């Protein structure tokens, strides 16, 4: 019984790590997309670079 509890706990831990990895991946992709959009916007007009939407590009 102890062994099955340990296995179950390990599987639950692995599932939680996968969920965290998926969320981290999604957030990283959104950040990358935001940077690309910001760079395109800045190449079109410099007023976009100073906007609150893309503060990292100032």
Swiss-Prot record:
This is Conotoxin Ar5.4. Residues 1-20 form a propeptide. Belongs to the conotoxin T superfamily. One of its GO terms (molecular function) is toxin activity. It comes from the Eukaryota. The keyword Membrane does not apply. Its main location: secreted. Contains 2 disulfide bonds that can be either 'C1-C3, C2-C4' or 'C1-C4, C2-C3', since these disulfide connectivities have been observed for conotoxins with cysteine framework V (for examples, see AC P0DQQ7 and AC P81755). The lineage of its organism: Eukaryota, Metazoa, Spiralia, Lophotrochozoa, Mollusca. The cysteine framework is V (CC-CC). One of its GO terms (cellular component) is extracellular region. Keywords: Disulfide bond, Neurotoxin, Secreted, Toxin. It is found in: Secreted. It comes from Conus arenatus (Sand-dusted cone). Expressed by the venom duct.
